[in-house]
């Protein structure tokens, strides 16, 4: 998920536990994709009550209402195309509605289906005027940041229109709390289908082109940290930590 700032987004190990709020259960985090051997990460500790709630209600199902974080295998796989029979159907409609819902709630400017645990080629893009105005005018001009309405693409493809590389900081909701400078092409064309199967094409430059490239990368299992200048990698809270 691309952030505006950056200035750009159960497999329980069931165990018997004593009755009590302080008790905890060790579990592995869920993913819609199996993790490679040896990189599952440490078992998390879940309180007894959270464990019980999950046991009764079951684990959340994709598309999630949260954003998957780096380390989740779903972010590293290549997303599969949506089948033609699914176009205009309830499953795709639910996915696109959830993408828009989470994107707006998180106040980010782009979101891809893999970030909600669904390895399919679907993405949503939107830069509302109100969100755009939160960026200082000089910065908006420098980064060619202009608002644009909601656009949803299914099975999109990308064509570079201007291969000049422009470098600015980016963030991502799937690498929460971090920014880095990333080079992107100045102008691109994205083409694909809307959720009803109608052909859509958009030529974009500047910040909009950056957002498109960021989200298209997600469909290929690529994160901004794979393309960043590693010396610019920044924790956005570093000053707060030192305060």
Swiss-Prot record:
Co(2+) binds at residues 172, 214, 218. It is found in: Mitochondrion. One of its GO terms (molecular function) is metal ion binding. Substrate binds at residues 71, 169, 171. Residues 165-175 are annotated as: Hydrophobic dimerization interface. Signal peptide: none annotated. The active site is at residue 215. It is an enzyme of class 3 (hydrolase). Ubiquitous. Residues 1-39 form a transit peptide. Keywords: Cobalt, Hydrolase, Metal-binding, Mitochondrion, Protein biosynthesis, Transit peptide. Its cofactor is Co(2+). Binds 1 Co(2+) ion. Its EC number is 3.5.1.88. Belongs to the polypeptide deformylase family. NCBIfam families: PRK00150.1-3. Homodimer. Removes the formyl group from the N-terminal Met of newly synthesized proteins. This is Peptide deformylase, mitochondrial. It comes from Homo sapiens (Human).
